[in-house]
């Protein structure tokens, strides 16, 4: 009896301790869950803040990169960029007219001769007449002196300045580049030149351009010494084409593209001829492989060994 009473007392104490511990454990578990939820919310908020900060910093870096290297210019459908496409020679002639009347006062094309224009934009008589309009310093003569003479087809297009120092002095320290290879010397050359010529605009709010420079987002740094040169009706085309800003930009870029790659049409034609000849050679090789060599390759020799 005494042993049974002791056992019952021990059981009651154990049950009582479990009943007291259960609310405590539930309170601790709920507290831990609340703390986990709060820490998860803080982590999510921190990640969101880091993402927003990263986006803002990325946009800032992108804006700084555009300001430093120039705005990325769009791609335009130039008609001579096709595999078998050729230059628009009427556009080249108009582009040369734009170069003569607008660009030649500052920019040179020292790699182009008048004879290069024959058969491309002008007849031989027209090119000779243009060359005769300039005076070229030549010599020495029999007396050892230099002299001037009318230009010939073999002469290069005239340069506006005698040297780089004179060019910089006339342009406020800026040096106008030679345009002979400009579409190959610039990244995305044709599109860049067209976007640069037609991309002048007023500077946005908060950007100041110092005196003597002009805002152009396509030029590295956004400030260029060359003013806007292409304006509607600035040139009167010989063929009556409306001389809009976009038309003049397209024509002068066509002329500069030809100047940089005058052999493009011949290269494309030669490539087409080689592809045609190699295709015939491939067909002939396939014929001999299938009907001649395969017969020899599959032939078996039988040796009759006589004992």
Curated annotation (Swiss-Prot):
The chain crosses the membrane at residues 271-288. Signal peptide: none annotated. Residues 1-64 form a transit peptide. Residues 90-197 form the Cytochrome c domain. Heme c binds at residues 103, 106-107, 226. It is found in: Mitochondrion inner membrane. Gene3D superfamilies: Cytochrome c-like domain, Cytochrome c1, transmembrane anchor, C-terminal. It is a single-pass membrane protein. One of its GO terms (molecular function) is metal ion binding. Residues 289-307 are mitochondrial matrix. PANTHER family: CYTOCHROME C1, CYTOCHROME C1, HEME PROTEIN, MITOCHONDRIAL. Component of the ubiquinol-cytochrome c oxidoreductase (cytochrome b-c1 complex, complex III, CIII), a multisubunit enzyme composed of 10 subunits. The complex is composed of 3 respiratory subunits cytochrome b (MT-CYB), cytochrome c1 (CYC1-1 or CYC1-2) and Rieske protein (UCR1-1 or UCR1-2), 2 core protein subunits MPPalpha1 (or MPPalpha2) and MPPB, and 5 low-molecular weight protein subunits QCR7-1 (or QCR7-2), UCRQ-1 (or UCRQ-2), QCR9, UCRY and probably QCR6-1 (or QCR6-2). This is Cytochrome c1 2, heme protein, mitochondrial. It comes from Arabidopsis thaliana.
């Amino acid at each position: 009896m005494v042993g049974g009473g002791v056992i019952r007392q021990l059981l009651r104490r154990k049950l009582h301790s479990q009943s007291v511990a259960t609310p405590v454990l539930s309170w601790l578990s709920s507290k831990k869950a609340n703390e986990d939820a709060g820490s998860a919310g803080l982590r999510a908020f921190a990640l969101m803040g880091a993402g927003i900060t990263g986006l803002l910093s990325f946009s800032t870096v992108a804006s700084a990169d555009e300001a430093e290297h120039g705005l990325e210019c769009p791609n335009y459908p130039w008609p001579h960029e096709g595999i078998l496409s050729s230059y628009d020679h009427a556009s080249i002639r108009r582009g040369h007219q734009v170069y003569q009347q607008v660009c030649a006062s500052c920019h040179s094309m020292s790699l182009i001769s008048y004879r290069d224009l024959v058969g491309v934009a002008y007849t031989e008589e027209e090119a000779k007449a243009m060359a005769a309009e300039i005076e070229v310093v030549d010599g020495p003569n029999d007396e050892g002196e230099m002299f001037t003479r009318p230009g010939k087809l073999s002469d290069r297009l005239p340069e506006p300045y005698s040297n780089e120092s004179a060019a910089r002095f006339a342009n406020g320290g800026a040096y106008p580049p030679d345009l002979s290879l400009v579409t190959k010397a610039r990244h995305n050359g044709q599109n860049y030149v067209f976007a640069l010529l037609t991309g002048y605009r007023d500077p946005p709010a908060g950007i100041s351009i110092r005196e003597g420079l002009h805002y152009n987002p396509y030029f590295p740094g956004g400030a260029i010494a060359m003013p806007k040169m292409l304006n509607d009706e600035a040139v009167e085309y010989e063929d009556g084409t409306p001389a809009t800003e976009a038309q003049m930009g397209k024509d002068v870029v066509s002329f500069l593209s030809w100047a940089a790659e005058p052999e493009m049409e011949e290269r494309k034609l030669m490539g087409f001829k080689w592809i045609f000849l190699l295709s015939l050679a491939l067909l002939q090789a396939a014929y001999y492989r299938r009907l001649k060599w395969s017969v020899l390759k599959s032939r078996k020799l039988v040796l009759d060994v006589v004992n």
